[in-house]
UniProtKB/Swiss-Prot annotation:
Gene name per UniProt: infC
PANTHER family assigned to the protein according to its UniProt record, in alphabetical order: TRANSLATION INITIATION FACTOR IF-3, TRANSLATION INITIATION FACTOR IF-3, MITOCHONDRIAL
Disordered, as annotated region: 185-217
UniProt source species: Methylacidiphilum infernorum (isolate V4) (Methylokorus infernorum (strain V4))
Keywords attached to this entry: Cytoplasm, Initiation factor, Protein biosynthesis
Name assigned to this protein: Translation initiation factor IF-3
Length: 217
């Protein structure tokens, strides 16, 4: 059984146990989860002592306060674990801005940023705002977003296709499980250069194909 004390999980949260509980009467829950009803604080403390356990105040603002008879050490560990799990579950979201006329070099930089974030388990949201007459280039903007899906498939995935909302197009990526994430753009310089050259060649091929199509038309 622990001495009278308070467990501080952070600056705002604490738990009173045993003789530190101030209420004169408390609603007591035993170690099996059964309610023992409202008892004088002395009797509640005695029952906990008889079982070699602690009286822990779990709902201090209830009327009367609710206390449980349990192993304080295990209770403290459980609280600590929940806090850690909660922090892990709070996935950070990083936002990246794009421009419809972005050049290949800047596009590669955006890919590297997104890949680095997702490699760390962070979500990434791309935003593209069409200014003024750029609204007439919706097809280019959507193609750019669809290209992102292909270029980042090795590290993340998106739940829905990019859609235009007013003048803004957004696309959110969720990182793949850690054991399935691969690096493509954040590699040693020699490998990155090779990939950059491959992307340039692909872009040239697309431009040439587009020009030939216009000639035929």
């Amino acid at each position: 059984m622990h001495p009278s004390s308070r467990f501080h999980s952070n600056k705002k949260t604490f738990v009173r146990i045993n003789n530190a509980i101030r209420a004169k009467e408390v609603l007591v829950i035993d170690s099996t989860g059964k309610s023992l009803g409202v008892l004088p604080i002395q009797e509640a403390q005695q029952r906990a002592q008889q079982q070699g356990l602690d009286l822990v105040e779990v709902s201090p603002h209830a009327h009367p306060p609710v206390c449980k008879i349990l192993d304080y050490g295990k209770f403290k560990y459980s609280l600590s674990k929940k806090e850690k799990d909660s922090k892990k579950g709070a996935t950070k979201l990083k936002e990246i801005q794009l421009h419809v006329n972005i050049n290949e070099h800047d596009f590669l930089i955006k890919l590297k940023q997104a890949e680095a974030f997702m490699a760390k388990g962070m979500k990434v949201k791309f935003n593209l705002f069409l200014r003024g007459r750029e609204i007439t280039h919706q097809d280019l903007a959507l193609n750019l977003m669809n290209r992102l899906i292909k270029e980042l498939a090795h590290v993340g995935q998106t739940d829905q296709e990019p859609k235009l909302a007013g003048r803004n197009i957004s696309l959110t990526f969720t990182p793949l499980p850690a054991n399935k994430r691969l690096l493509k753009y954040n590699l040693p310089e020699t490998e990155t250069t090779r990939i950059r050259e491959e992307n340039r060649e692909k872009q040239k091929e697309k431009e040439n194909t587009s020009k030939e199509g216009n000639k035929d038309a």
